Amino acid sequence: FDYEQMSGRAGRPQYDNTGYSYLIAKSMEEAIDLEERYVNGDVEPTNSKLIENKDAVFKQIIAQVASTLAKTPEDLQDFFRKTFYGYQMTSNPSMSFFAEDSLKFEIESALEFLLQNRIIQATPEGLKTTPFGNLIAKSNYSVETAVKIKEYATNAEHIDPNELIYHLAQTPDLPLISFKGRKSKDPVREKLASSGLFALDIGNPEATTVSLIEWINERNEYEIENAYNVYSSSTRRAAYEASLLIKFTKNTMEVLGKYNFSKDLDFLSARLYYGVKEDIIPLVVGVKRLGRKRARNIVDIFGEDLRPYSEEQLQKIEGIGPKLAKSIKQFADNY
């Protein structure tokens, strides 16, 4: 099947009459095997995994309701009957007997979950998505992640960056940073404790949490890796995804009517994106390509108010040339 998918892309539609795909063999014997298996062989049976993937079912139901294509459970059942899964269930003699009841049960279970979590609501006009449901429909996040974030948003009385990062590290949408083999996990446990976080088990979510806490406190990947015995090469990616999840958290809170945390969440999102402490956020955001290292040097040497200093003085800092000094000066004068 993979070979058919690949070779089917040979040639450019509307430009080429013929397309060519090649299978490279290391020997004549292998070439014969490849031809027999991939070129002349039958495509292996394909089975739908839709119902096995709970999140896919949730997302399909949300999409159908949000687009007003389905207003009742019966509409949803009719939609799923027309999917590849529905076709396989009804066409298979061994499954067709209980296919209808099985499909109905799965949809009703998923719908009950979505109703309980206020993602979908029942109205006199039929099923409708809530504002939170619309937010999920427009995002790429799993329903599990969205529900976890909503739970946090509902209960939050203030924003603790460390606590929120740990909460996000336990969702399926944040890429995790892993430990190096069987090295000691004690440094991670100790850092969590000093950050006001308690964990019974220390695993990749905890390693990710500690790495991101250190990242927003301006430690680099090398320092994080050596301090906590983790593979820190994916820190930047995890931090970027976490910054986007913080924005989703902000949107979720605003949907719930909690606007008083918006500024704090904007700052935390920026800290994760740039890997900085709060005091240099305006500088790294306001001056393109400055970076956190040079921004920190500037603030450490000149302070946060840069208006009294000339471009020539700024250029004395390593890595800052005339062009960048001009941008910094313009930012300082207009901030």
Task: Report the location of each language-model feature.
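Conserved segment of the helicase C-terminal RecA-like domain
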Residues: 1-37
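Long, largely alpha-helical accessory region at the distal end of helicase-like NTP-driven motors
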Residues: 41, 46-136
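Helix-loop-beta junctions that constitute the ligand-sensing/allosteric loops
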Residues: 303-305
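Helical mechanochemical/support elements of P-loop NTPase systems and associated helical scaffolds
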Residues: 2-6, 17-20, 53, 72, ...
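Helix-hairpin-helix
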Residues: 281-300, 311-329
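C-terminal helical accessory/scaffold domains
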Residues: 108-117, 121-292
